[in-house]
Amino acid sequence: MLRYSNLFNPGSNYIYGNAETYGKDREYDIVTCMFAFHEIPKEGHRRILNNSIRISKNKVIIVDISTDYKPSKMMLAGEPYTLEYISNIDKLMEDFSFEKRNLIKGHVDIWTYNKAN
């Protein structure tokens, strides 16, 4: 993903790291986490959100599967945290004051946190 980001946006700086601990305070303009939360145990979500807000100057964007997504049995066999994610993520994002928008009905949601400068 980063390789393609640099291809389409030369001169921009994209970095990846441990989402729970990476970065210095207010080090990045925008922090994103793409299609990861449904792969992570519930306990990690809060740590990731706290850290993302800490290292962001302006905005945090979380993109993941929609909470109205209906996973198949085959998907659930390899995605042990998906049902827990679907059941709990909206409340957690609300607790952190993220705004939710459905990007693709039944498939993709996006949550945005805007920091006051």
Regions found by a protein language model. Name each.
Residues 1-22:
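Class I SAM-dependent methyltransferase SAM/SAH-binding core
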Residues 32:
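A conserved beta-strand element that flanks and buttresses the S-adenosyl-L-methionine
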Residues 36:
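Hydrophobic adenine-recognition pocket in adenosine-nucleotide-binding enzymes
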Residues 40-51, 55:
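A short, conserved alpha-helix within the catalytic core of class I
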Residues 56-67:
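Conserved beta-strand signature within the Rossmann-like core of class I S-adenosyl-L-methionine
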Residues 73-95:
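Conserved Class I S-adenosyl-L-methionine
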Residues 97-117:
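Core SAM-dependent methyltransferase catalytic element
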